[in-house]
């Protein structure tokens, strides 16, 4: 197992009883690692985005077979490697699930990060400055036309993935 993380994650939080508490130690990582080590069929795991777990809504501790974005705990035994230029994390999740592997998205642990294109560096200048998010979204749709399509989200072109076939 190994971790891969985006460079624009600002904080990690514990989400319990609709309360978010900032984590100042590595405890969330140890807990997620401990969880996945109990199973042989997990390809990836990681924390959900804090923005998707408002304190007003209850959430289960984890969700199976959905996206793992930006902060990934990856099983070294899966036969897949990064491919493409954009959305490599989503592509990796989809390929694994299509082959029967599971993903675990933790709601008990959350990541707070800046939105795409709001922080200089990373892929902002190289990929997004000219064409926005269109090419990145289009590439994922072309790789997974059976479950992905283009949509408008957050005032920009984005991809939308139907994860229902993996439930």
Q: Where would I find each of the regions flagged by the language model?
A:
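C-terminal catalytic/acceptor-binding lobe
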Residues: 84-86, 90-167
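A structural signal for short, well-ordered beta-strand segments and their strand-loop junctions
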Residues: 2-5, 43-48, 103-106, 149-151
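Conserved catalytic core of nucleotide-sugar-dependent glycosyltransferases
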Residues: 3, 9-95
């Amino acid at each position: 197992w190994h971790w891969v993380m985006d460079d624009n994650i600002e904080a990690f939080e514990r989400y319990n009883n609709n309360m978010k508490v900032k984590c100042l130690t590595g405890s969330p990582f140890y807990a997620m690692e401990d969880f996945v080590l109990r199973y042989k069929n997990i390809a990836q795991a990681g924390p959900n985005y804090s923005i998707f777990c408002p304190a007003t809504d209850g959430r289960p501790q984890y969700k199976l077979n959905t996206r793992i974005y930006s902060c990934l705990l990856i099983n070294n035994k899966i036969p897949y490697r990064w491919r493409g230029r954009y959305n490599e994390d989503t592509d990796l999740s989809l390929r694994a699930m299509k082959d029967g592997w599971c993903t675990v998205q933790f709601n008990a642990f959350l990541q707070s990060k800046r939105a795409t294109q709001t922080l200089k560096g990373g892929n902002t200048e190289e990929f997004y400055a000219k064409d926005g998010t269109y090419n990145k979204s289009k590439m994922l749709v072309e790789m997974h036309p059976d479950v992905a399509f283009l949509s408008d989200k957050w005032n920009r072109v984005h991809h939308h993935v139907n994860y229902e076939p993996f439930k």
